[in-house]
Amino acid sequence: MGDSDDEYDRRRRDKFRRERSDYDRSRERDERRRGDDWNDREWDRGRERRSRGEYRDYDRNRRERFSPPRHELSPPQKRMRRDWDEHSSDPYHSGYEMPYAGGGGGPAYGPPQPWGHPDVHIVQHPVLPIQARLGSIAEIDLGVPPPVMKTFKEFLLSLDDAVDETEAVKRYNDYKLDFRRQQMQDFFLAHKDEEWFRSKYHPDEVGKRRQEARGALQNRLRVFLSLMESGWFDNLLLDIDKADAIVKMLDAAVIKMEGGTENDLRILEQEEEEEQAGKPGEPNKKEESRVGPGLGDGERKANEKDDKKEDGKQAENESSSDDKIKKSEGDGDKEEKKEDSEKEAKKSSKKRNRKHSGDDSFDEGSVSESESESESGQAEEEKEEADETLKEKEKPKEEEREKPKDAPGLECKPRPLHKTCSLFMRNIAPNISRAEIISLCKRYPGFMRVALSEPQPERRFFRRGWVTFDRSVNIKEICWNLQNIRLRECELSPGVNRDLTRRVRNINGITQHKQIVRNDIKLAAKLVHTLDDRTQLWAPEPGTPALPASLPSQNPILKNITDYLIEEVSAEEEELLGSSGGAPPEEPPKEGNPAEINVERDEKLIKVLDKLLLYLRIVHSLDYYNTCEYPNEDEMPNRCGIIHVRGPMPPNRISHGEVLEWQKTFEEKLTPLLSVRESLSEEEAQKMGRKDPEQEVEKFVTSNTQELGKDKWLCPLSGKKFKGPEFVRKHIFNKHAEKIEEVKKEVAFFNNFLTDAKRPALPEIKPAQPPGPAQILPPGLTPGLPYPHQTPQGLMPYGQPRPPILGYGAGAVRPAVPTGGPPYPHAPYGAGRGNYDAFRGQGGYPGKPRNRMVRGDPRAIVEYRDLDAPDDVDFF
């Protein structure tokens, strides 16, 4: 009786199980099956005959191994594929069709290949967020990739042979212009409803934004002038050894910006006294931790403990002052105070238990699933405690209001307005508005403001966000409550934002040299003048008459600035001394050996420069020595966070060439900040498709004038019928004037976007150029791309393979394949069941026969090279 199908399948499975468990028998069967493969058989037999000791003759550095050889970064080896199901050199039998094979698989939609062939890479989508790049690519809807501009060579293929070269170039330029115009219009339609885009270009939103920015600038200017009048800048120098004084000045500026008074500035003195009253070794430790670029866990915890101690001291001072006030109120208040203290003790014990379990997870800004499950049962308790905290925090506010009435003679305690707590949200979708985040976070006590970064084109225009709270709140509890909240199907996933570690950072000490300082004064004054003009900061208010253009700027720090830009030389004295037989003039330095000079420091010039730099930093949020502008700093958690200053004096003498090189490089870095914001000229705007408001209104009226029949016309906006088109037109202008205004605003909206020379756009996609025949690259690198560690993952364009990690690729040059077939066929998807060829160097050249059961040869390949022969790249 014949076996059933089930029995046959079971036996087949048993056969493969035996092959996997009994490796020697499978190898012998494979040798019998491949009788013609003499090389493999001989190598395997030799391997059986040799003992472990004999292997040491080939490579004495080889480590003794008693387990099967592990290939690093490779999966466990499975059953090897046989001749009948493997076509490594035949593209027509591949298991998965590559882009060039004409199949349905597009370049960006292949299945994930974590251990695939070195030639088969997952094509990186240029606008994927980090979660999509770290997860499976099959789970993400990549959308339709944008069209790629044709190269001139590709464009010529679409032209008739009769077209001459001049006409072809002209047509190609027209094609490029049309392509860019279409790309821009598509981008406008795709993003015009998003808040970040409307706030930049919509006429209604632009006016509000400018007004807010002007108000913030004027507030910063008032703070700067107030600090200057109070003498904060008199003895302040922007040198790294004055870091503590610089931080104190920045904190004073922040307190003033937050609406603080002179009384609130006293808290800076109290902090200094507390630091000095602490252990004598503590300040040195804190300075060391500030200087280090990254803190270890132990150091971070120590700093947190110090901060907690300082907060505890402040709380004790507050409670002692409250006791003095409450003693005068009577015995009844004492009983209430006892009850309050008991409640606080209970609450603090609960909070300590809860903080114990969650501290480590919150430090990293993420919570594990096990913790979320274990703490999910405490949700009701947390709500009750949150209500208690709200009530208890409202009580002190009421008491503070009553204090001035009861005890007008007592002074208010200074507030630490320069310190905040904040949350960081890495991925905020472009369709989420700022108002939605504000309404979500307003529910928690101590909320102050929200800051959103500029959208990132390479990350699907996702933005980063910072939510700032008062220093008194429990930021980790708020972070926990916001963990699993979704806005418009987007998880906010907040994390606690740590305080800045090094607020004062230094650059090269060569900047102390007199010649460089004078050049910096010139550049800084130019920057101040440019930014003041751009923001109209010193311009008169709209109601007041304008000043004549000949009058100088009203900015007080630019007064008499030219006196310091002119270098004084004693040319007459030198001439007289030289002609009267004095010392001969010094020979000019030779070009080959430039003369070295000492760093010369001029305190007077440095004082003038520092006032300019502080004006730029506080008023315009521009860090001069870092050559960058900090955008939206008023909305960030730290309103004056980081500043770069001059480093220590260089120990060695400097050459004149070094000074000139520094000045040249620094001016190049400042050029983008000095350039006025560019906008397209009228001619360029017309070429790019600038719209005329009157023409667009005519188009709108025409499209809403429909003829139903003879002497019967319809206005679809209202559904009314008229005898002629002129009546419909009159009706639209009279009854639908708001629609006409909307059309005009839409035109202005588009034109504002078009005329911005720095308008956002998708990253430009350039097809990769295949390398020349003699171009050799290191193994594993794709030509036309930088090294893997130099390129962000999200910036890979469509249709271009991802560069593999060094050491993964085969030894031969693997050109990128933008279009058309490769010079040799790729291996099929998943060939080799783990693809060990790449690790043992078996993929050296196309069509090379594979040794199927070879695990790896410890011996180096012996090769013969004729030194007299011409260069050849085909050595093994």
From Swiss-Prot:
Phosphothreonine: residues carrying this PTM: T544, T671
GO cellular component: cytoplasm; nuclear body; nucleoplasm
GO molecular function: DNA binding
Basic and acidic residues composition-biased segments: 8-73, 297-347, 388-413
UniProt keyword annotation of Transcription regulation present: yes
Name of the protein: Serrate RNA effector molecule homolog
Residue positions where N-acetylglycine is found in the record: G2
Biological source species: Bos taurus
